[in-house]
């Protein structure tokens, strides 16, 4: 496959350092508030990317961190707990990390290889800072804070394509007290009264954001690893500064081979932000729509482009999900009606080939979704009408190809339905079949309505009837 690499500004052939193993790191949330649909877009994209690689036979080690101590967390704790904040601040990240896992499960995001937390890795971060000071890339300020000296790193700005001289000129501010340069950034922040703190050789305090991710990613994945990702808003300064730290610490130009970034999410043409009051939480969306519909809505936009979020888009996606399930349910039932030999040639190989071709081209999920949807409609309009002319092996092969495509996008995840509901629907289908054979159509229509009350829709294909059961949640 070929993927766009922000580091080179080119679509490149994707290869891994170790054949058959893909190691990746995605910057996780700072858990100080509700997880929103912008977050969801990033983590669903990398879940699809992971599923695609797994479908090609890769083992994928995907690491997602939690920045569980930060200025925003401290501010939230003070807002909620007042003078008790210094004791109770951990309640804030714990609450929103739990919410992250809750919505991830409802979005069918597969568990990561590891979920490191900043607070569990402070000792490692202190060791890194000591090494950077010793190497001459960092310095200690009078208050005990430690800053990374950007000017000591060759080619700073390589990821964001910015020159250090232009960045300094653009800053238009005097350096903060203790800083040598306005672009220098904190590796260690000195403690202030009422804040959480950890011991260090310089002063009580806590690690800086940019250091945290590079320490945790390389700890779990080694150096170099295959891909590093996140939202496009992290390119500068966060990812730029990660590269600078790793370059100073390891002496490597780039500690990750591919840098993959997901575009902004907009609402009515404006970037989603708290200041505009247009933030939409994942809990809100998932209270009204299925996780599969939201996944599909994300996939209907190319990952690198801005995505305009709307509930109309989710309505459209939910309708597509319904069609995908109809094709799956009814084709699954049709296996029993297939014969021993093929009397016609029918398959969905062309849809599957086009699906994978789209993903091979910079992960074009909009085209892949079109192919999956086209395959579903072909199954309903053509395959189900010809089941009696196909062998069981052929029908099973079509079903397997269809499910393989759906699994990459992360839909048809609710294939299992309540056994008692399915048995009740099957019984109604059998009763209705007898009524139709006896031409008691009014009674047959009544039975159809009873099935509908159970959440099932019945579709007739000549003498055969197949059903699909509506999924909830």
From Swiss-Prot:
Residue positions of motif 'KMSKS' region: 271-275
Binding site for ATP: 274
Cofactor(s), names only, from the UniProt record: Zn(2+)
Name of the molecule in the record: Cysteine--tRNA ligase
Domain of life assignment: Archaea
Cofactor note: Binds 1 zinc ion per subunit.
Keyword presence, Chaperone: no
